């Protein structure tokens, strides 16, 4: 198996990493970086509250554990080549308690975190296919800032929610993107 087909969450994290949304992070974290972020909420001497990981299931790990290079695909489209792949494990219950709090067992993402993250991967990447590393609802921060400058907008308000955007949110975003 020289291919890894990634899921929607991994694709989203990958796009965000490549577009500096998680700045100063440029890659999925290594084990040492993960522990530093969880314990100190810090990465490269800057506040960083949650590690951005690339987890794989037990099934995928059993197929790829001896390889060091792969091609990443999302929805059958080539994204990039990854190499210098290293795998690591963590005490997921201990980590979950730090991430989700003392009632971590009741947290909606706890079971998903355990199920989807048998092992974690850290790697370098090359040969990105930029065209396939885009999403119609994503605008890179750098492009968004340029649009603001062009329109001479000096004030901006925003909001954030943990909830998944529904159709009304998508319509609002689409409407606002067309305005810019």
What would you call each of these model-derived segments?
Residues 1-170, 174-180:
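Non-catalytic terminal extensions that flank enzyme cores
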